[in-house]
Design a protein with these regions (language model features):
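Structured, active/binding-site neighborhoods that engage oxygen-rich ligands
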Residues: 1-180
Length: 180
């Protein structure tokens, strides 16, 4: 609802996130998000660079009518909680990949755009990542890996399987890859 109404503010989004989060409080949210969610006051963003901003951003990429709009909506979506530059960057990189895929860009174009605009190293393979990957819930250690799984995939199922097979925060990686 928030993404489709141009008159909605960051406060509306924060209230919307809290409404849904409180309706479903036992979903394995990150600790900082859960504290924000359950606080009595609608508190300020908490400077997070966790991957929650990237996990929830897919509607922004799907709804956007331009790449600039996808980036703008992703930034707005991230900033209400994950206002650290890496949290915003992670959300924007995923929304950009989704928008570019939705509009018919090749995987080579998507890879080049993400590398050039977000500085992610997408030259590794899933096999290389899998050998050394550990649990990490930051955008900078989750988003590139999810994007690589998408780039290596052949269809939706293989994307999800590749993402989850990396290990680490695999449910979040699966959610991110699934949006792409």
């Amino acid at each position: 609802d928030w993404v489709t109404k141009k008159s909605q503010t960051d406060r509306h989004l924060a209230l919307y996130l809290r409404e849904w989060g409180r309706k479903y409080p036992n979903r394995g949210y990150g600790g900082m998000f859960l504290r924000w969610l359950l606080s009595k006051e609608l508190s300020s963003p908490y400077n997070s660079f966790g991957n929650g901003s990237a996990m929830r951003v897919s509607p922004c990429g799907f709804y956007a009518q331009s790449l600039d709009e996808a980036l703008f909506l992703a930034k707005q979506s991230a900033e209400v909680t994950h206002n650290h530059p890496e949290g915003i960057k992670g959300a924007q990189s995923v929304a950009a990949a989704i928008y570019l895929a939705k509009t018919g860009s090749t995987k080579a174009i998507i890879k080049e755009y993400i590398e050039n605009n977000f500085g992610y190293d997408l030259s590794r393979t899933c096999d290389e990542i899998r050998r050394v990957y550990k649990f990490n819930e930051t955008c900078q250690e989750t988003c590139p890996e999810a994007i690589i799984a998408f780039l290596e995939s052949h269809d939706y199922e293989s994307a999800i399987r590749l993402g989850i097979s990396l290990g680490g925060d695999s449910d979040t990686i699966g959610a991110i890859v699934g949006g792409m």
